[in-house]
Regions:
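Alpha-helical elements of the RecA-like P-loop NTPase motor core of helicases
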Residues: 1, 29, 62-66, 89, ...
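NAD(P)+-binding Rossmann beta1-loop-alpha1 motif at the extreme N-terminus of oxidoreductases
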Residues: 1-40, 44-48, 117-118, 141
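Conserved beta-strand termini and adjacent loop/short-helix elements that scaffold enzyme active sites
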Residues: 21, 39-41, 107, 148-151
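Rossmann-like NAD(P)(H) cofactor-binding subdomain of soluble oxidoreductases
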Residues: 34, 42-54, 58-122
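Internal alpha-helical scaffold of NAD(P)-dependent oxidoreductase catalytic cores
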Residues: 90, 94-103, 119-156, 166-172
Length: 172
């Protein structure tokens, strides 16, 4: 939800550009009220999309990616995966189509992305410089971004979660 909130505030996108897919009807109702398209169907959400952001719990990544694999256009669509602790090798395996895998980006924002104040860590996987710039431009609109090696991603995850942990203590 936080990433969609930030994208809705972005100057790069209009609400009509954004489709949110979720299994939770109140979440869909909220984003529909903001002008985004909403659906319960992940495959439907992928049709016609230039950028697909899979933002799920780590244990849901495999099922989600395998569920959209057949409708992904590896040549024209950009894929962002936001999930802690999921190696790119696993994602490649899950998305393999006869030896072909998509370009994708491992991305770890923090909760401040909803307010366009995130420090977002990005690991390009088989991406060109041009593709990487397109993705960093989007996340720079939502705060700041830093390109990093995948081996450093666990540290990025810890840093991204630190804000949420601190907010939990403040709330207590």
């Amino acid at each position: 939800g936080a990433m969609a909130e930030g994208l809705l505030q972005s100057e790069k996108f209009t609400p009509a550009d954004i489709t949110v897919s979720d299994h939770n009807q109140p979440v869909l109702d909220h984003f529909a009220s903001e002008g985004a398209s909403v659906t319960l169907d992940n495959q439907l959400a992928c049709h016609g999309a230039d950028l697909i952001c899979v933002v799920v719990k780590p244990w849901c990544v495999e099922k989600t990616l395998k569920g959209i694999k057949d409708v992904l256009d590896y040549k024209s669509q950009k894929l962002v995966v936001v999930a802690a602790g999921v190696p790119s090798a696993n994602i490649k395996e899950w998305l393999d189509k006869d030896g072909v895998t998509p370009t994708f980006f491992l991305v770890m924002p923090n909760i401040a992305i909803a307010y366009k104040q995130s420090m977002t860590f990005i690991t390009p996987v088989d991406a060109s410089t041009t593709e990487t710039k397109q993705i960093t431009d989007i996340f720079d609109e939502l705060g700041e971004s830093l390109i990093m090696e995948e081996r450093l991603f666990p540290a990025a995850t810890a840093m991204s979660c630190a804000i949420a942990y601190a907010m939990r203590y403040v709330r207590a």
